[in-house]
Amino acid sequence: MICLSFVLSYYFVVRFARDKMQRKFSMFFQSTAFEKCSFDCDLYGEIEFDPLIQSGFFKKHYAFYSDMQGSGEICGGVKFEFARLGVHDDINGGDFWGIFFHATLEKSVKQATFIVPNEIGFENKKCKKVAINDSEFNKIFSVFGGDTESVAQILTPKFIKRLMKFEKRLISLTDNKIYIFLNTGLGDFEPKFSKSVLRENPFLPLKREILHCLFITKILNSNL
């Protein structure tokens, strides 16, 4: 009995020490990586509820979990925020992970516009499906908006080219806001102190996705 108690005590002490070391390692690695990208980063920071609902991607009954929140500014005044996001549908069931990004543009779009992968059953009663004169783009994405003219202002060839590189993303534009959700399916970007971050760097996918979100935001900000 004493032996079992000792083993359990030893197990919990070791586990606590390991988890504490993991947190310190993650915080150091993430803060350093974000600093090089000129982002403000809070490893355990959460994103607010309102932007999630305002994006039009999620319903109010969904349960959200977010962390690894970051923020910054580009183009001399366009503020952005992102976070790792977990979503659970309390009614229909199902969980999915990804990255949620939103930014405030210098100008506003004429009408709300949604760009979503064809594999997603997207519905919005306020928007109609808009035909895009690009067969390759139409194979992957559907666009919902007000009219062809306002959508054409957004979907320039440069914008489409960048968007085509990453298929599993949802984009919505409302007023002067852009919202992007990347359905990466990755539930854990944190580096493991027991593994070499040179050979296995879990931050790189997150960094790559955020940089593409910023690039898309820059293109859109200049188009409006």
List where the protein language model places each region:
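Charged, low-complexity intrinsically disordered regions
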Residues: S31-L224
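Transmembrane alpha-helices and immediately adjacent membrane-cytoplasm interface residues
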Residues: I2-M27
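Accessible peptide chain termini
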Residues: M1-I2, Q54
